[in-house]
Amino acid sequence: MNMLMILSVNIILSTCLIMIAFWLPQLNVYTEKANPYECGFDPMSSARLPFSMKFFLVAITFLLFDLEIALLLPLPWAIQMHNINMMMSTAFILVSILALGLAYEWLQKGLEWTE
């Protein structure tokens, strides 16, 4: 019962915050806020530079594996637990999911800079 109540409160709170986030920016639409500030001068060109999607994919991959290391670092302390099989299976599942994601990205040529 307690877990069900926590889940329902989290879902309701998340839904409310998402609805507010979509509704709130539509109240005040100012075109001047979208323009870059150029110290009083009119902008010569667009300030919105294109972003490399390849760099974004490599950065996300780096963050995922950095998170993996952060999650696996407490394993030596977790070995002191009585249920080692549960801890090892959780670590194996985590590493397997990340390895499958890396293999998929590699096969889709997401890590190559040139085509």
Curated annotation (Swiss-Prot):
One Gene Ontology molecular-function label: NADH dehydrogenase (ubiquinone) activity
First-level EC class: translocase
Transmembrane segments: 4-24, 55-75, 84-104
GO biological process: mitochondrial electron transport, NADH to ubiquinone
Compartments reported by the entry: Mitochondrion inner membrane
GO cellular component: mitochondrial inner membrane; NADH dehydrogenase complex
Signal peptide location: none
Superkingdom, taxonomy of origin: Eukaryota
Pfam families (UniProt xref): Oxidored_q4 (PF00507)
Main location per the UniProt record: mitochondrion
Keyword Ribosomal protein: no
Catalytic activity: a ubiquinone + NADH + 5 H(+)(in) = a ubiquinol + NAD(+) + 4 H(+)(out)
Keywords for the protein's UniProt record, in alphabetical order: Electron transport, Membrane, Mitochondrion, Mitochondrion inner membrane, NAD, Respiratory chain, Translocase, Transmembrane, Transmembrane helix, Transport, Ubiquinone
Enzyme Commission code(s) on record: 7.1.1.2
InterPro entries: NADH_UbQ/plastoQ_OxRdtase_su3 (IPR000440), NDAH_ubi_oxred_su3_sf (IPR038430)
Membrane topology: Multi-pass membrane protein
Family: Belongs to the complex I subunit 3 family.
Primary role: Core subunit of the mitochondrial membrane respiratory chain NADH dehydrogenase (Complex I) which catalyzes electron transfer from NADH through the respiratory chain, using ubiquinone as an electron acceptor. Essential for the catalytic activity of complex I.
Subunit structure: Core subunit of respiratory chain NADH dehydrogenase (Complex I) which is composed of 45 different subunits. Interacts with TMEM186. Interacts with TMEM242.
Record's protein name: NADH-ubiquinone oxidoreductase chain 3
Organism: Podomys floridanus
